[in-house]
Regions:
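Electrostatic cytochrome c docking/interface patches
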Residues: 17-44
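Gly/Gly-Pro-rich "capping" loops immediately C-terminal to redox-active cysteine motifs
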Residues: 31, 50, 54-95, 101-115
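Short pre-active-site segment immediately N-terminal to redox-active cysteine/selenocysteine motifs
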Residues: 44-48, 56, 128
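An amphipathic alpha-helix signature
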Residues: 83-91, 126-133, 137
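Periplasmic OmpA-like peptidoglycan-binding domain that tethers envelope proteins to the cell wall
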Residues: 116-123
Length: 140
């Protein structure tokens, strides 16, 4: 196994190749599923996306009063960012903005202030990242 592959498996680097402000290569061979991605984004147990972001004002997220306002709205995310840009923002947004409050959702090493239950664990697995990307791409 090469050094880069070993580091990627360890979580020390972003999985895949970062090109500019994105990660163009999917993390899995299975395409993302937008329906599963929507469930992750709306989940109050897994993704927790709506803790900081607001979602589209539609039947997708009827609980608008419980949505966050700390981070950019997810409405129109698929029009604002490419698939590669969305993927990198989900995997590790601090690669783009070191001061970002958004947690690295697919990195487990080199993080600070991580709760004991999450030490050494990724919030989302690779397929879940691809599912969220697929959902966000539908938000035009």
């Amino acid at each position: 196994m090469g050094l880069l592959a070993a580091l990627a498996l360890s979580g020390l680097v972003v999985v895949g190749t970062v090109v500019g402000d994105g990660n163009p290569a999917p993390l899995t061979a299975t395409p993302g599923d937008a329906v599963r991605g929507r469930a992750i984004v709306g989940s109050r147990q897994l993704g927790l996306c709506l803790l900081c972001h607001s979602g589209p004002a539609s039947a997708d997220f009827p609980q608008a009063r419980l949505q966050g306002t700390l981070a950019p709205s997810l409405e129109g995310a698929g029009a604002r960012w490419s698939e590669a840009q969305l993927r990198l923002r989900i995997v590790d947004s601090r690669r783009l903005n070191h001061n970002s409050l958004m947690p690295a959702l697919h990195r487990s090493e080199g993080l600070t202030q991580v709760g004991a239950a999450w030490q050494g664990r990724r919030v989302l697995d690779a397929q879940q990242v691809e599912d969220v990307v697929a959902y966000l791409r539908t938000l035009q």
